[in-house]
Regions:
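Short, small-residue-biased leader/transition segments that mark boundaries at the very start
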Residues: 1-5
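Short, hydrophobic alpha-helical segments
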Residues: 6-13, 104, 142
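Rossmann-like dinucleotide-binding cores of NAD(P)H-dependent redox enzymes
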Residues: 13-41
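Flexible, glycine-rich terminal cap/loop adjacent to redox cofactors
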Residues: 28-35, 43-145
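Short, glycine/acidic-enriched loop or turn micro-motifs at the edges of active sites
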Residues: 79, 169, 188
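Catalytic cysteine-centered active loop of the rhodanese-like fold, especially the PTP/DSP P-loop
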Residues: 190-229
Length: 229
């Protein structure tokens, strides 16, 4: 806004391209950031969209002080055009939201996220940066490598016709899980496929997302047609 006023006063004819609403705030020890259009705004505008959510670390896990973050992006389910992104975390949130904002500003897609080049060293990032991973997950959704289910859909399902498969370890399962879930650890899944119903929709899940996705792929490759992750 200030730049537009300055240019007008000076007589410069520089077109204003508009803003995409990028913001960031410190909330106690956490950082919250947003850019572009979130799902709520897209639904209000009746724009068809899909979303992907990941929970990576701020940098390589083997390097000390890696902190968790959650990244959600919204995108067009056909073209992959990137609509928006939100991030909640502790460290590295600012640079990730800036990367997503830059792609949106240039009318980019989730495929551009996959190709963004970042500086890498273990104290600062991972070999596959979280922004790129968000793009990979979105690409998996668009190409049908995985069919996601969102919490809004899952909260209303009837257990009689559905099967919740928790693929975490028994120790993780003992701490907490979803009501009615059955625990088959990912490492045991291939040997215990006969315990799963083929006449029910199976929802795979884990703590973060990777193991749930791998379980989904295992089931699909073994002939299970009713699977969501």
């Amino acid at each position: 806004r200030q730049m537009c006023i300055r240019d007008s006063i000076q007589g410069a004819h520089i077109p204003y391209e508009g803003a995409i609403g990028t913001s960031i705030a410190k909330v106690f020890d956490m950082t919250v950031a947003s850019t572009g259009l979130p799902g709520k705004r897209l639904r209000q505008a009746e724009i068809n969209y899909m979303s992907s959510t990941i929970h990576p670390s701020s940098h390589a896990g083997y390097y000390p002080d890696a902190m968790p973050m959650s990244i959600k992006i919204t995108f067009d389910p056909k073209t992959g055009k990137l609509y928006g992104g939100q991030i909640v975390g502790y460290d590295g949130v600012d640079k990730r939201i800036d990367e997503i904002a830059l792609v949106i500003k240039h009318e980019g897609t989730i495929y551009d996220l996959m190709k963004v080049e970042q500086a890498y060293a273990p104290p600062f990032s991972s070999a596959k940066d979280p922004v790129a991973v968000a793009g990979y997950v979105a690409e998996n959704i668009i190409t049908g490598k995985v069919q996601p289910v969102y919490w809004r859909q899952l909260r209303d399902i009837e257990m009689e016709n559905n099967f919740l498969l928790d693929v975490r370890t028994p120790d993780e399962f003992s701490l907490n899980t979803l009501p009615g879930a059955v625990n088959i650890p990912l490492d045991e899944l291939r040997d215990r496929l006969d315990e799963l119903p083929k006449d029910k929709m199976i929802y795979t899940f884990c703590a973060v997302g990777l193991r749930g996705y791998l379980a989904y792929r295992i089931l699909v490759q073994h002939g299970f047609e009713k699977v969501r992750n």
